[in-house]
Amino acid sequence: METIGNFIQNMAFPTENPYKLSGDFGNSTLEPTVTAALRILHESPAPFNTEFFSRKNVDFIQKKLISETKRYTSFDIGPQNEDELIMMMAGIYVQDSTFDGNIKAGLRKLNTLVITECLKQILPGVRAYALYVRDASLPFSGGGEEAFKRPELATLKGSKVLSGFLPLDRNAS
């Protein structure tokens, strides 16, 4: 530790760039998606993780999510939130990245897992939206028409008589 004035400066934490958690991120050739993911994971750049978190792979996953959603639901969706996608990719990477030296096979495995997990969240949302749109476009037919019919004027009170009802008259002998 180093003392500057009355302040103690912790030298273990990088003071020149407090967002640099680990790894060699001074290399300007790293893509922002790779840098963000590696900072989350506290890993140094390596061929497999830089390829997995590359812009090309993120775009591939986005396109695959759009096409698979179209195939399963016939709905067109837009690209998903990239920050959430990177977090999902990082979670899958931490759980299932058993890299055996074959980058293509490892990428194929992890991409399949990421796409499957994302679709588990996307498809129910799209189906719920489709049901909402369908129900919102139909007239109300929930069987509660009698309960929700338009109100009647209060001046009509007492003018309706139930059939089969005989009022009792106490004054009658």
Swiss-Prot record:
Pfam families recorded: P8_CR
Up-regulation conditions: Expressed in the late phase of the viral replicative cycle.
UniProt subcellular location: Virion
Zinc-finger as UniProt keyword: no
Any one GO cellular component localisation term in the record: viral capsid
Predominant place of localization: virion
Keywords: Capsid protein, Late protein, Virion
Task performed by this protein: One of the minor capsid proteins that constitute a network internal to the major capsid proteins and outside the lipid membrane. The minor capsid proteins glue and stabilize the capsomers.
Subunit structure: Interacts with the major capsid protein.
Protein name per Swiss-Prot or TrEMBL: Minor capsid protein P8
